[in-house]
Amino acid sequence: MAILGLQGVRGGVGTTSLTAALAWALQILGENVLVIDASPDNLLRMSFNVDFVHQGGWARSLLDGQDWRDAGLRYTSQLDLLPFGQLTSQEWENPQAWQETLGEIGSAIQALKASGRYSWILLDLPYGESPLTRQLVSLCDHTLAIAQVDANCHIRLHQQALPAGAHILINDLRIGSQLQDDLYQVWLQSQRRLLPIVIHRDEAMAECMASKQPLGEYRSDSLAAEEVLTLANWCLLHDAGDKTSAGSLR
């Protein structure tokens, strides 16, 4: 099994929707998947038909001294969700007070990996370098850095470090945009970790969260859903290749 983290090069690049879409695609391919919201924004739940008023989550449980396992939700027989949970306004104002407490989730994720219950654990990681985020990134076997082809992300790719070994995944690529086409050609020449897969702009991606469903469940025939399914297959092949390479060294 593998732990896969998805993190935006900046905020607002569609990381949460992509995480939900990839989780759905992997379970369509027969994988057992746990998707974990690691962002205090607590938005991943909205892609899995969880009530807006639901405040529970692994972080909320740890902060309240409860068992984080009780926060897990079943979506399909092969797809489970672990929301972050809702923070209070006081907790938002003083994140240093709870970062250490939430660090306990690291050992929990390692135990889940060791159990073999899931083929994949997907982490929806927030943008930034908080202590908790750094800890979770260090647990990942693979990391996808999500970027949109714009000047903002172009600058960031040259001035901020990506997680070690991260692959860059382009999201929301617009057909007919001269600027995006120009930047994309530059990236093809300069970004060696660029994935050979892109996710094109698709209205279904925006609509699926409004419908509280993962992309592939909402519109399996959409272009973006087909591209995410291709991404899921790439993840399976890439993970299998890494394990084969590791085994050959022993």
Curated annotation (Swiss-Prot):
| InterPro entries assigned to the protein according to its UniProt record, in alphabetical order | Cellulose_synthase_operon_BcsQ (IPR017746), P-loop_NTPase (IPR027417), ParA/MinD_ATPase (IPR050625)
Asked whether the keyword Nucleotide-binding is assigned, the reply is: yes
Sorted keywords for this record are:
ATP-binding, Cytoplasm, Nucleotide-binding
- Pfam families reported in the protein's UniProt record: CBP_BcsQ (PF06564)
Binding positions (ATP)? 9-16
**Of which family is this protein a member?**
Belongs to the BcsQ family.
Tell me, in a sentence or two, what this protein's role is: Essential for cellulose biosynthesis. May play a role in subcellular localization of an active cellulose biosynthesis apparatus at the bacterial cell pole.
Protein known as:
Cellulose biosynthesis protein BcsQ
